[in-house]
Amino acid sequence: VRRLIKAVSNLDYPKDCLQIQILDDSIDETKEICEEEYQKLLDSGFDVELIHRKDRVGYKAGALENGMESAKGDYIYILDADFVPDSDVLHKMIHFFTDDRVGMVQTRWGHINKSYSILTRVQALFLDGHHAVEQTARSRSGRFFNFNGTAGILRKSAIIDSGGWQHDTICEDLDLSYRAQMKRWKFIYLVDVVTPAELPPNMDGFK
């Protein structure tokens, strides 16, 4: 979490156009880490909000829905805790939204620790197949493809128009993706824009 928040603070984007939300449903020491990093961002002049939920209703979908209530911007950039975005990534993505029908822009996942173990190498192989082959082919051929839950930007009005984040599914990203595309929102996949992430290094992390 600390690494992600540091990377977000280094994004090359005007502070007055950026709101940072830390959505924390943790039940361990992560809560204290989030509070420390929140204060650092606040002291550095960021528009930042820390939302810690105790009930965890709806899990990730519930956290995203809750965050939407106070999100100020028109575009929502979602990052899971194990991702580390490059500083220029927003400049490579945001201009696609000049098309009013673009509802989502997805980047390809990279792998910080691909060579760590057999498990990480296998995960990387399958994920690369999904991203570099399946997602790319679906996007370029005009077929439906899904937002991968992280490392992408969604237009807030597209989320609202498509019915928002739903709690009655374990794949809230896939669910929203298809509802949005059925509403004729365009999705764009950027195979050449990579957002690095850490793969679970062992079976405990993989679970």
Where are these regions (language model features)?
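Short, well-formed alpha-helical segments that are part of the catalytic scaffolds
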Residues: V1-N10
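Active-site donor/metal-binding and catalytic loop motifs
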Residues: R3, V191-F206
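Long helical/loop segments within the catalytic core of UDP-sugar-dependent glycosyltransferases
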Residues: Y38-Y75, S87-I170, Q181, M203, ...
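Catalytic donor-sugar/metal-binding loop of nucleotide-sugar-dependent glycosyltransferases
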Residues: D168, S177-T195
